[in-house]
Amino acid sequence: MTGFDCWIMPTFRLASVLNFKIQEIKIMKYIIVGAVAGGASAAARLRRLDEHAEIIIFEKGEYISYANCGLPYYIGDVIKDRDKLFVQTAASFQQRFNIDVQIMTEVIAINPIAKTITAIKSPTGETYEEAYDKLILSPGAEPVRPPLPGVDIEGIFTLRSVRDTDLIKGYLNRKSARRAVVVGAGFIGLEMAENFHHLGLQVSIVEMGGQVLAPVDFPIASIVQQHIRSKGVALYLNAAVASFAKSGEAITVSLNNGKQLTADIVILSIGVRPDTRLALQAGLKTGEARGIWVNEYLQTSNPDIYAVGDAIEFKNPITGISMMTYLAGPANKQGRSCANNIVLGNVQKYNGSINTAIVKVFDLTLATAGTASKHLKAANIDHVVSTTHNGSHAAYYPNAQQMTMQIAFSPIDGRLLNAQAVGYDGVDKRIDVLSTFIKQGKTVYDLAEFEQAYAPSYSSAKDPVNMAGFVAENILMERLKIFYWNETGNIKAHDLFIDVRRKDEYDAGNIERAINLPVDEIRSRLHAIPKDTNIFIYCEAGLRGYLAQRILRQHGFDNVFNLSGGYKTWKACTDESVLIARAG
């Protein structure tokens, strides 16, 4: 008798004695609606957790699991090979994961009592029902196409799917397009503007708001706007499209300010809305933001139906306000968590998204995490904002590039609430660090202690993340009093306004009413500075202003304020404000 026999036989005898019977395991049937980000992620995870389940995924389009974030770059010929856009095909997904993939098949109804769905096949129109044990909704969002006069003219497109991409690409190949108008200056709008520019088109951007990229604050957006203009792209802010009209082979785009633009192709990139039609038909609860309501386990108001992706809403972990999150990263992670909860029994809580996002705008990179200052104000959340300008790596090592970073934090405990960064190099790795700090509820004191990998070609001994923490720490410890670019007009005639840069810098450009007193001369001229008035100081980026402030404060000058972000921030913001005002 082998050792194995010695071990196994008593086990079977014990089972026999106890009259043990192996119970038949119920084979579960999972149905998923939507096969792009969240849906495909959920399907693959379900299979990894449950090899024996029956899994059916429905996709009304022709393609599944594609890289929708890469679509603008395929249009712009940055991505040459169309096949690179597809993470999986229906056939490869089905073969690898043993999942029944039903493409060109739209789920049109849910019967939550009978636990069935009704689907319709294209192009035959055949309808049929499928039963389910658990259902996952991942219907995504639909692009907004406003009911404007002429909006259905040939050559006006939205971009959301591979089909949209093929239509745009085909149109460009058929037409000799020279001029493009992009309506909307969000992430997709700016990416499309860049890619049209890459194709050699003359590009105009029309944006109803007063800045590009609504998730960030104006001081950061102003840097992006200047960069866009430097590329020869026309930018029309505070402008809305009133109508479209055909003018021969061209399209006339009429704005509400009376201006008219001529285009050969128009992209509408003015936002998306959650696709909640199925959820509403099934009687599922929707929320304050009009998305599908889910609990912390991504479970809808029906316990057998879960939902993920662009169609759901969830409370923002910073503001507590229900919101939509139209980002691929959270959607994919939700799909995985949802599958865990279905198979393992609600074991993984979803904590919401802080909307960490990044976008390439020509040579520039902008990234954000958390809740912007303007949205914190709208939510009545008290906070302080500070801005720093630093190099992407050590200044003495070649090719260091400027990076501007703005953070928002609690004045009570220093908890980090938002981070925004813009620059040419290293923005991505800094925002990932800052996003982690925000997500974990860390403070600006933690930023000051952040330990990064350092070599002069990669960073500085005091990384830009550290510098942001140092400045915020000084503000909280009341070693640094600040004022902002849009408050310079509030400085009174009897206040003292000092530019502490060198004379040549001052002569090259300064803020009206400021006198020049270089920081290195302050100690020798203390006798000439009155102590009974407010003193407002600025330098190029903020550091020399801080040094001047510390000198004055320790010589008995109490009311000394330093301009956050310095002349760089003031200049970018005021220049853009003037351009916007003139255009309006």
Specify the residue positions occupied by each region the protein language model found:
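A Rossmann-like FAD-binding core segment of flavoenzymes
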Residues: 52, 96, 102-123, 130, ...
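Rhodanese-like catalytic fold shared by cysteine-dependent sulfurtransferases
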Residues: 10, 445-456, 460-486, 490-496, ...
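Rossmann-like dinucleotide-binding cores of NAD(P)H-dependent redox enzymes
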Residues: 86, 179-180, 187-245, 327-331, ...
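FAD-site-proximal beta/loop scaffold in flavoenzymes
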Residues: 152-176, 248, 252-254, 259-340, ...
